[in-house]
């Protein structure tokens, strides 16, 4: 079988100021392409593509169907909490039964290629979401007796939020569908007004024995008008009139201009491949003029997080954008903050009854409003002024990496400065003077841990906010009348609570329980209010970090927790542990999927993106007005290089590491800011312009650079070339689903001899009807039983319909959440425990002396996360 497209080659070469960078981008990215040697069997493992607005995820669904699950980031309820809506999927229905298949995402061209073998022939295809048009293109060629039927399956239950429904809301009306000429369409009217339309057209463009079909599909959304169908039709007519060569050319041109904004290479195929898949993901999920990225991007499915979360999620979603020198993608976030500023002020009036504040709850709708659903029901737990301050820190990052003073001084256009003032204003009436004469905060929430007075989360954010406002007020001579108040707050604010284990959650609340969020260490990273370069600080941070990772055996330390830990270790200059934690993230198969997406029961894609930021932190840091070269590198990484990573102060930084040492650095100033650098050379080095270099002591140097000037620091030859690292015999194309490796996907069931197959089951609770008890005994790998959302305990019980002797139970678990369980049988009217344990894993067989019973119950006594779930629960004689 052959795929349709051959990969083109594009080169990027510079020769600026003794610099030579020659990268064959097509060949370099090719080694990071995710490859599926067997077809993914579910959404979470699928190949994905997107353009910052619409997206698709491709996987096999059933014996003869490939499903392109469709999403569009701005299709929302427009009522209540304004959550995302589900759209449905475009099906490639084949005449034959699928025997084998492969997929490859060609990163260089942002294109999915696939080949499928059936019992009637072969299909090869390519699919892409155009970089600049809201259009999915699929081209498919068939051989033999194979034929394709294209069908759009509209989502009948549009509501994507699996946790919080509003039964009293008027249902959305049924969708309508039809055909006009070559265009087929499905239109959905919303109960709240407006419509969205999925429309497509097909073209049998090759009548030869290799039959080629071409499909264009678009998604349009309008509110409050009903014009989406008209817009969808116009889009299809426009793109179908374009020569296909031009359509492909403009798509590739966008992506080939995008990748060379910066370059990173490390001598580890798994980590380098993961990084470049995140760079692909960023541009697939974000555009400067697109919607703000939530937890799902354009690839949504049923979820418990169908809104914007601001107590960690949006912050880490955008975290890799800045150092990667891809600031244009971050503009979608700036636009969200700027355009919704009045709503943030309205939130403060509603929550704190102040007119000059600005805030959110821990989650908002896509208008920045608190909404009328679960956020309000949870007050005061999720009414936390720190969440919005942390959200604004992201805006400040954009400013610091760009040094665009308009982001601060043009206050009519840009809301940052005034919103930060309002966010800090929300703390004013909360602060009280204690017996020690210090300012103290009341009981507030430390994200996901619990409540505590003077909690370190809010103390660190209040400090950062006041410090930042004073810095900007002084730099831009804003003469803000509130400046003395911020100074007094900083002067009087109580110290961070600590104990023998380091930073506490808050005053009187030690860190006693395993917990996935590093909210009590925000002052270390990303706020950098406390420097680990001071020995007394480093000691307390080391204690805190070790305690966080090990208390209760780290049972609640998740994949993204490890990515955060990697940042923290890199901040301390500990490259060995930074790498260890980054590997821990990548190897956490419970959460990190073969396609690099991150699933915690539902998609939370930001938890993969933050791992890209972790690698950047090992390579380059620039907090505290100091550029640090290779600050967190492990000894095993003898070589590494990067080109045009961006540092705070608007510097482009390139560097080469050879034989475990820094050998070459280039710094280019984009704004003429003061430049201080820790080059991390071993021994003496040379500057190509000595007059611009001044030693400050302790490995710190000042560089005198005007705007658009560059300087090179080096050992050996000044003319060194930035090239990809040699991966040696490492397995390239690490990511993607490999044959027989789907341990965390749909399980391979062996139910021969099951005594419980299809027998009636009951349960303590179910997540929804789609996850009821009988799904756990139906013998189908694609279905499962799940405890109700938020619950960590529950049971499932099988009625064997007569007393039967058995000595084994097989359990197939979804995502490995169960931490404690028991197995019971009913003896007359009494339940008797016959087995206990702590972990199930993907599959586990429990054996025990034979018992005779009609009823058998599996009890989940505790879980690492809510809604633990089993694919199957089966009883065997022996």
Where are these regions (language model features)?
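Short, surface-exposed beta-strand/strand-loop-strand elements in extracellular ectodomains
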Residues: 817-829
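Beta-sandwich/jelly-roll carbohydrate-recognition scaffolds of carbohydrate-active enzymes
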Residues: 20-270, 275-276, 289, 650, ...
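Catalytic cores of secreted or luminal carbohydrate-active enzymes
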Residues: 86-93, 605-654, 658
